[in-house]
């Protein structure tokens, strides 16, 4: 999703990446969904840490997912067991909505990054803000180098910040938001 426009985790060694399709792929938060991407290079068998993939599975006639599926053991188990046991199958309408959102994802990702950086810079210089948490905010040279390496197109649009004051100050702040809204 948006993360892959900004950083490509599998290229940097991640074996599994989990995306929230709700937040960025759809673009409007109207549909709930997620995506699991497996790099396909991890040796599930040799690590000795994943018996649910390497040992015989009684619900699948004793097959071992690693023996039957090799590098695709994890994703096959997700499809075979998770979908069967939880019904986590996306509906046709949800699929359509996510596909519509994918058409504008790259443009939205650019705008998300631009807008987030403006807000992050504003908050980072605001006297009522204690600290801003975003990959672009650092004085440490090694952190700046990592930011440049891993986020050449920007550090994303998700950030947090701490305001100065007590719980009432925080409540008053939330009640007076105009640019953002609290959805939780």
List each model region and its residues:
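Conserved PLP-enzyme active-site core in the AAT-like
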Residues: 3-125, 133
């Amino acid at each position: 999703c948006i993360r892959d426009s900004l950083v490509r985790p599998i290229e940097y060694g991640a074996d599994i990446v989990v995306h929230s399709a709700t937040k960025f792929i759809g673009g409007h938060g109207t549909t709930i969904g997620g995506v699991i991407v497996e790099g396909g290079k991890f040796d599930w068998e040799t690590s000795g840490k994943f018996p649910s993939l390497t040992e015989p599975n009684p619900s699948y006639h004793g097959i071992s997912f690693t023996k039957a599926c090799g590098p695709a053991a994890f994703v096959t188990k997700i499809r075979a067991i998770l979908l069967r046991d939880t019904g986590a199958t996306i509906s046709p309408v949800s699929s359509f909505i996510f596909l519509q959102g994918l058409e504008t994802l790259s443009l939205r990702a650019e705008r998300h990054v631009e807008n987030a950086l403006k807000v992050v810079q504003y908050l980072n210089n605001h006297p009522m803000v204690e600290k801003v948490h975003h990959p672009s905010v650092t004085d440490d040279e090694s952190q700046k180098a990592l930011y440049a390496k891993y986020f050449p197109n920007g550090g994303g649009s998700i950030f947090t910040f701490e305001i100065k004051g007590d719980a009432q100050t925080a409540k008053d702040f939330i009640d007076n938001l105009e640019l953002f809204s609290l959805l939780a």
